[in-house]
Amino acid sequence: MEKVKQTIRAPRGTELQTKGWVQEAALRMLMNNLDPEVAEKPEELVVYGGIGRAARNWESYNAIVDSLKTLESDETLLVQSGKPVAIFKSHEDAPRVLLANSNLVPKWANWNHFRELEKKGLMMYGQMTAGSWIYIGTQGILQGTYETFGEAARQHFGGSLKGTLTLTAGLGGMGGAQPLAVTMNGGVVIAIDVDKRSIDRRIEKRYCDMYTESLEEALTVANEYKEKKEPISIGLLGNAAEILPELVKRNITPDLVTDQTSAHDPLNGYIPVGYTLEEAAKLREEDPERYVQLSKESMTKHVEAMLAMQAKGAITFDYGNNIRQVAFDEGLKNAFDFPGFVPAFIRPLFCEGKGPFRWVALSGDPEDIYKTDEVILREFADNEHLCNWIRMARQQVEFQGLPSRICWLGYGERAKFGRIINEMVANGELSAPIVIGRDHLDCGSVASPNRETEAMKDGSDAVADWPILNALINSVNGASWVSVHHGGGVGMGYSLHAGMVIVADGTEAAAKRIERVLTSDPGMGVVRHVDAGYDLAVETAKEKGVNIPMMK
């Protein structure tokens, strides 16, 4: 992959570079994904998650930008794995962009085949929000992480993580949310990363409090704050596959254990034990097969240590990076003895159509986001947990790139909020249109048996019709751009998922599209969980009037 040193930053203000606000939104969000404040390796078009890219290569990126600048408001741009392949006449209510990233026929859906295609320049890895142009930096996963640790606190520690120690690893674009999410819940956390730059970045953005290269210092500080029942987050430089076994050897057991290293990609995402970053990069280039094998062996040691901590009483869970699967394939037959975070903590929210709803101010003006915060505090005042989140986010979350906000809203709430935002754009309360989107990790948009759809009540973990139906209904209902991806979060062969974005530009046409899309999109989450037999989803569907033909 050619590296290009250029600083990409989304335009701000109300001057259009394109022929309409929907096209402008797509252009700005693509560029925002590659803003140095947002992207992990912008010179390689890598946004987050190992090699999750916004475009296939620089030639494709430039062609997408040119296409968006000339795209008419009754045309649709098609993007195939980060490359623009066609512009067709459609209509004004159709999506302006349709994206399909990293999709492979199941028999060939593995990393080896993907890498062959990638080397030939035929495919890219889109992760979830990298290739669908709606990544907003670490805030994008922060509330989900906050909710996860909050639910763990409610289930196991009396509602707060005060006086507890969490041990985790991985401080990249996704995992970087963990330190702040734990301290927001009152706890102490040691977060390990092998790359000093990742820790430095989280400290710079106020997601992590301190840095150390010493395990002794990390433990001393952690114990001191745990005793005082005060929160602190400690970024520890090192390899989790070395540090966790060492802690087991010393009989040190944290209260909570998880992991968000990029274990989904053994070649590009995980560093084997005994290698520096530089040595790992050299081996990766010279002998990728040996690298992958060493990586998998290290992951197995990592999971063995997590299981040992679980056996000693630590609340242990997989945070969706497929590390258990790798260890299982390497012969660790009890790798799945600790659960994934969705069945352990998040599924009830999915049953209510809740998920990581986000919005971005195309103006670039933080005041536009602060005004929308006030809408949440006013319109959803009865949801104290949500309002607390908004207040904390305002105080503690630093914007990356275009100002944005995330919060988990459910069926009915999303459409209500979208309507209000569109009205605020129409009457000039907000200085420019707002982009509304979400993660692919949502209630009805993903099939991922080792993550979002793990341990479904009816055994339908691997049924992948749901994300396809989600993308189809969002497209016909007028989402601004819609994406269908493979392999996000857990790697090739383990997930299919869909994304959508809708632009609130203040027009009446946008109001109608928003109403349709922000009803059907979370509605798919309710429907999917009704179909799987969840009582809470059935209650939600009946209460909200979701039309499900065979619901009992």
UniProtKB/Swiss-Prot annotation:
Pathway: Amino-acid degradation; L-histidine degradation into L-glutamate; N-formimidoyl-L-glutamate from L-histidine: step 2/3
Primary location: cytoplasm
GO terms under biological process: L-histidine catabolic process to glutamate and formamide; L-histidine catabolic process to glutamate and formate
Catalysis: reaction(s): 4-imidazolone-5-propanoate = trans-urocanate + H2O
Active-site residue numbers: 407
Function statement: Catalyzes the conversion of urocanate to 4-imidazolone-5-propionate.
Protein name: Urocanate hydratase
Species of provenance: Bacillus cereus (strain ATCC 10987 / NRS 248)
Gene from which the chain derives: hutU
